[in-house]
Amino acid sequence: MAALGITVALLVWMATLMLISIWKQIYSRWKLPPGPFPLPIIGNILQVDIKNVPKSLAKLAEQYGPVFTLYLGSQRTVVLHGYKAVKEVLLDHKNDLSGRGEVFAFQSHKDRGITFNNGPGWKDTRRLSLSTLRDYGMGKRGNEERIQREIPFLLEALRGTRGQPFDPTFLLGFAPFNVIADILFHKHFDYSDQTGLRIQKLFNENFHLLSTGWLQLYNIFPSYLHYLPGSHRKVLRNVAELKDYSLERVKEHQESLDPTCSRDFTDCLLQELQKERYGTEPWYTLDNIAVTVADLFFAGTETTSTTLRYGLLILMKYPEVEEKLHEEIDRVIGPSRVPAIKDRLEMPYMDAVVHEIQRFIDLLPSNLPHVANQDTMFRGYVIPKGTVVIPTLDSVLFDKQEFPDPEKFKPEHFLNENGKFKYSDYFKAFSAGKRVCVGEGLARMELFLFLSAILQHFNLKSLVDPKDIDLSPCTIGFAKIPPHYKLCVVPRSG
């Protein structure tokens, strides 16, 4: 019996040595950046706090430097930490490292659309989408007018709260939701519309669930966890429902399409489908158009909505900042004129506050994953083709030299000694390079105009003492999700 026990122990020991040997051979095949030694199957998952991955990556960067290798399960991952490394990857190596890493909750979007597309048609889909959005004024005068048209609806909904406590999640959300809906479908939703509310709830739920620990694990071990019960099933159902909604709208547009007149973004993409250049491409299908529309609808709504919601909470925490904004708005815009983008030149404090809100909330701390399109030399190391690349945006937005006291909310981070707006190249809230957010111009415009309009007409009133407001995100993962709260908006006199 004792001999049998010794034999089993020896076999286990030999098997362990063999696994380690095989793993070392795989690990040493390329001159990878340094990093912790991975275990078979689970990789370095034990060195990562799945409930706060960005914090874990920052700690590992202190140990291994600004470029290090990490295995999330069996997936080889290279992490970039700090302004220089992140900028180098996103801009200097934008062709080599511009692929999209897989986000398994969006498998139905794989090789389609813009955000999660890593297929042969991604570049053309993105190029076509950008040119079409430019035609519809993305970041220019056309979208300024769209936002200005939406402002009265937002103000009316806020007045409808009659100074009573309310949850701002979907009321605020309808503003950017309607702007992007107008671009995509030439459609406007009433703030009580149940379809619009349902879509927003799906957006909001997915944004939150994607940031939970379970979804982080699911993206690392999809084949193991896919058939188990869990919140990933809810996300997959939501993604499918949103895609179906977009496909229905695309088919409706197709049935009433006028080849000589474009009503909106969807019409433009459908018209391209009829042309020889794209019509013969195997990747350019109704399904690809539907996913492209779904990508833009989600990104164009939820990121701006969350930023606005977080922004109001921050302003209630710092009433002295709100007071300065009221003074600037009264001086430049007055009590009744609709805010305009030209006002930004005379409103450096509002411009600084908008930028500081985005920096401080650090909405997408680890960016969306990139992937190496080919073997790439980087600072003397090799990043092999297929390696996931994570440019950590939080390491840039919280750089201590560029932003003194980065953990504090300070609009002065974006003001010079004369009180004028000071742009920082470290402001990478929208990423950079070939995967930069296509809606950056629109989002900047919406945040400035919507916040200006709200504060032009209302004072924000917290239900608790400002010093007791907790700005800590309730969930950190795919995104940093703000805590739930209620507030009152009180009409300003005059």
UniProtKB/Swiss-Prot annotation:
It is a peripheral membrane protein. Pathway: Lipid metabolism; fatty acid metabolism. The omega-1 hydroxylase activity is stimulated by cytochrome b5. PROSITE patterns: CYTOCHROME_P450 (PS00086). GO terms for cellular component: cytoplasm; endoplasmic reticulum membrane; intracellular membrane-bounded organelle; mitochondrial inner membrane. Its cofactor is heme. Its main location: endoplasmic reticulum. It is an enzyme of class 1 (oxidoreductase). It is found in: Endoplasmic reticulum membrane; Microsome membrane; Mitochondrion inner membrane. It catalyses: an organic molecule + reduced [NADPH--hemoprotein reductase] + O2 = an alcohol + oxidized [NADPH--hemoprotein reductase] + H2O + H(+); (5Z,8Z,11Z)-eicosatrienoate + reduced [NADPH--hemoprotein reductase] + O2 = 19-hydroxy-(5Z,8Z,11Z)-eicosatrienoate + oxidized [NADPH--hemoprotein reductase] + H2O + H(+); (5Z,8Z,11Z,14Z,17Z)-eicosapentaenoate + reduced [NADPH--hemoprotein reductase] + O2 = 19-hydroxy-(5Z,8Z,11Z,14Z,17Z)-eicosapentaenoate + oxidized [NADPH--hemoprotein reductase] + H2O + H(+); (4Z,7Z,10Z,13Z,16Z,19Z)-docosahexaenoate + reduced [NADPH--hemoprotein reductase] + O2 = 21-hydroxy-(4Z,7Z,10Z,13Z,16Z,19Z)-docosahexaenoate + oxidized [NADPH--hemoprotein reductase] + H2O + H(+). Its EC number is 1.14.14.1, 1.14.13.n7. Substrate binds at residues 298-303. Belongs to the cytochrome P450 family. A cytochrome P450 monooxygenase involved in the metabolism of fatty acids. Mechanistically, uses molecular oxygen inserting one oxygen atom into a substrate, and reducing the second into a water molecule, with two electrons provided by NADPH via cytochrome P450 reductase (NADPH--hemoprotein reductase). Catalyzes the hydroxylation of carbon-hydrogen bonds. Hydroxylates fatty acids specifically at the omega-1 position displaying the highest catalytic activity for saturated fatty acids. May be involved in the oxidative metabolism of xenobiotics. This is Cytochrome P450 2E1. It comes from Canis lupus familiaris. The gene is CYP2E1.
